[in-house]
């Protein structure tokens, strides 16, 4: 159960990072994007907690290590593969987390995955100063 839960958390963080990056690239405010997403069906813990607390302010200090998240994603993929689960989405999630681990190191916070997406998109997802 823990592996399934943490895989869903990893998937939510990765997908939310890409979705918000697309909006920022299109000129949207990432804080407002989170507010709108959180009022709809796309809401998840990345948009309700991780982005507002760690990504938008740029602190990247949510308190869960990159190495721990990648370990759980790897274990989930191994177990799911052993059960014959197709894993089209799972492999993609695993790939982006492995990339984030390589870029930011095992001691980094797992929210730094957003930096990997930012780098690829050529943007930053920070709260706009008022």
Residue ranges and their predicted role:
Residues 116-124:
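Extracellular cysteine-rich, disulfide-bonded domains and loops characteristic of secreted proteins
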Residues 8, 49-111, 117, 129:
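Interdomain hinge/lid region at the active-site interface
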Residues 16, 95, 125:
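Segments forming oxygen-rich coordination pockets for charged ligands
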Residues 42-43, 98, 122:
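Residue-level marker of structural boundaries
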Residues 31-39, 91-95:
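Beta-strand segments within the central parallel beta-sheet cores of soluble alpha/beta enzyme folds
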Residues 27-30, 86:
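Helix N-cap / loop-to-helix initiation motif
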Residues 1-26, 37-50, 67-71:
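Active-site-proximal catalytic alpha-helix in oxidoreductases
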């Amino acid at each position: 159960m823990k592996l399934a839960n943490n895989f869903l958390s990893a998937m939510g963080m990765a997908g939310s990072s890409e979705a918000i990056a697309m909006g920022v690239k299109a000129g949207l405010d990432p804080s407002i994007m989170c507010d709108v997403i959180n009022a709809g069906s796309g809401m998840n813990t990345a948009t309700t907690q991780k982005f507002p607390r760690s990504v938008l302010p740029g602190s990247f200090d949510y308190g869960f290590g990159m190495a721990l998240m990648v370990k759980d994603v790897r274990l989930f993929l191994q177990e799911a593969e052993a059960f014959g689960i197709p894993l089209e989405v799972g492999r993609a999630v695993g790939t982006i987390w492995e990339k984030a681990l390589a870029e930011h190191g095992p001691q980094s916070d797992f929210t730094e995955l957003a930096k990997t997406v930012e780098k690829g998109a050529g943007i930053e997802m920070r709260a706009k100063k008022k």
